[in-house]
Amino acid sequence: MCSSDLANSGITSINQLNGKNVATTTGTTSVQHLRRHERAAGVDFKEVYGKDHAESFLLLESGRADAFVMDGSILAGNIALSKNPSDFRIAGEVLSVEPIAIMMRKDDAALKKVADDTIKALASSGELAKMYDKWFVQPIPPKNTRVGLPVSDNTKAAWANLNDKPMEDYAKK
């Protein structure tokens, strides 16, 4: 997770959120991570919740929140679609690394094999990196909106080491 705030706020760390209003989206893992970091850092901030990511970003954009804590790709997409993208930035430390997966029935070994083989082939051929670049780095038609989120080292590592680990394995230090 990253925090996104007004570009001139000077917020660069969760430790600087003491006494601030921090937005996140109801029902997301960001809520859990935010509370864990709040306790661990001894920081006291007020959590404000949006019912969806657009509403959470609006809390930030309208000044009702000082930061919005969410996945980097969601933050980048909201920034790209905002009225004034240069007013916002992704700032601060990554609060967690979470895997993204394809959900399917547990007993469908044939479908799992197709999914695994396809993703492995896309990763090894470089096509997966090209698709990422197309949707997260390059302008997206028809409005040529640019999300501007370069592939992270964690994502590159995930592509190089495809696995079936549960999310809990990523939280271990």
Located regions from the model:
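Short, small-residue-biased leader/transition segments that mark boundaries at the very start
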Residues: 1-3
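Flexible hinge/capping segments at coil-to-helix
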Residues: 5-22
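Short beta-strand-to-loop elements that line the ligand-binding cleft
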Residues: 24, 43-52, 92
